[in-house]
């Protein structure tokens, strides 16, 4: 076992900067004790005194998360002792639901902790995008959280800061408990007296300074389950004082939509008397986890879209030919599913459970606004632009200081092919799934593995099929053939966004966002996805921007393929360079057009008022596009494309 270093006391400075400026981090970081060198990669986020970066082991090429704490933030002895204790507790842990800590070292400037990389961020970002999740998803996440808590408690460790933001997700959406800054060990019946935690999750015995132990983690898990199911903390209010009062008086309400097993478990975990709360082992065995089906895996799409828990469709309504156009309507309840007997076997329980989960998924979708968040996004951008936004003298340095990479969109369009003169627009999402928005307002989407197909009628009724099941109705043959042609063309003639992937467990539950509305101007193509993301690709300099109303953030992909993500309120507070500000002003106009002129766009998407007809056949300036004479034989020469997949 490697020795824990004693954190050296940093030199005192006469003028310490109060602002949380990014630490000075060398491009090559040396762990001299182990002879290991790390290359600093992209910025991952910040919290407290720490900034996190992707670090690549120079020898093995293994990528880890590097937590960097400037020594200037560790001036006092208690600060250094606290960090040493955090590492001492965390480094001995080894469990699938605990973030793995690899090493701990320092140089003259910083202290470094290398950790398991959790590429899908945390449950906090899931919450911001989804608010409430379905009960099967809540079982999936909560059961893993409890498994991790049980492991800690068996080692006499209390986490003491269990919350959505400390529950991280890897690429397989496995929950990983992290941030052991407040963790402590207890012996026997010892009760801790420290007032610590996060307001919405603090147990009453902590507030009352009555002494606390393992039960505070159970209380926090109760709060987490409540948030997952109902979209907000049980004791949240407009003021901290009122929140604490509600916690002390156990003043909360379980919504009537809750199932009995869920409500029962929440009440047990939020019992004001700590000794009456269940242990982690008892929670693990609670009937809630057996009261309905629980997925063994979830698709990445659940970070932004409700999964499809229903079966595949077996019959369809006949469709009439509609005018060419794009969909300007909202996603509606998923009332187009087939019988529940077609559910994947790894999530099947009994009929009542399946029906309830299906209804919950439909209810979750119904809560989406009819305009797919367009008015919400317009308001956010308008408020930003109404304020006096500070200028930036050193643009690049300032921008790097307040990025919010946790707000990066889950999905964006990486390729597109416009053939709306005849069929519609084809596109590829960043995960390599492919879709088409047809001129009759119907939509089709094929997952990255080429197995799971979704068809959405112009009425927004959804149907699901397996490409290899033989159950595809003949009515869809032409559209599936066109989808394959679009897919083949983008793979063969546009710069690849990545290789295809094999299907993984849980992918059969995926509901992917689809292109809802689009149009082209002389300057850009404007795309609106069904999950609320608005994307604008500028033709002249190939800069792209994606705006998410749920995260209240904007992501730019610049000419150098760098992805830069900022919260809108940070741009207002800290400043926005002109190179981005004028694009936000343009975006406001385009969002307004998406809201007010969708009916005009739907009549003829290939001939916009400000775009000459010849533009419909012109190719945008993309390094990944080829000339018309090189087009695939099954796609006409008027197809155009633009590749925006960034190199990270």
Curated annotation (Swiss-Prot):
One of its GO terms (molecular function) is protein serine/threonine kinase activity. SMART domains: S_TKc. Embryos. ATP binds at residues 44-52, 67. It is found in: Cytoplasm, Cytoskeleton, Microtubule organizing center, Centrosome; Midbody; Cytoplasm; Nucleus. Residues 1-24 are annotated as: Disordered. The active site is at residue 161. PROSITE patterns: POLO_BOX, PROTEIN_KINASE_ATP, PROTEIN_KINASE_DOM, PROTEIN_KINASE_ST. Its EC number is 2.7.11.21. Its main location: cytoplasm. It is an enzyme of class 2 (transferase). InterPro entries: Kinase-like_dom_sf (IPR011009), POLO_box_1 (IPR033701), POLO_box_2 (IPR033695), POLO_box_dom (IPR000959), POLO_box_dom_sf (IPR036947), Prot_kinase_dom (IPR000719), Protein_kinase_ATP_BS (IPR017441), Ser/Thr_kinase_AS (IPR008271). Disruption phenotype: Impaired protein polarity. Lengthened AB and P1 cell cycle times. RNAi-mediated knockdown causes defects in germline mitosis including cell-cylce arrest and formation of polyploid nuclei. RNAi-mediated knockdown in plk-2 mutant background causes a loss in sun-1 phosphorylation at 'Ser-8' but not at 'Ser-12'. Residues 612-629 have a biased composition (Low complexity). One of its GO terms (cellular component) is midbody. Residues 412-492, 514-596 form the POLO box domain. Interacts with mex-5, mex-6 and spat-1. Belongs to the protein kinase superfamily. Ser/Thr protein kinase family. CDC5/Polo subfamily. Required for oocyte nuclear envelope breakdown before entry of oocyte into spermatheca. In meiotic cells, required for spindle dynamics and probably for spindle attachment to the chromosomes. Zygotic role in the development of the germline and nerve cord. In mitotic cells, plays a role in spindle organization and centrosome maturation. Involved in asymmetric nuclear localization of cdc-25.1 during embryogenesis which affects cell division timing. Together with plk-2, regulates cytoplasm polarity in early embryos. May play a minor role in chromosome pairing and synapsis during oocyte meiosis I. The POLO box domains are involved in the asymmetric cytoplasmic localization. PANTHER family: SERINE/THREONINE-PROTEIN KINASE PLK, SERINE_THREONINE-PROTEIN KINASE PLK-1. This is Serine/threonine-protein kinase plk-1.
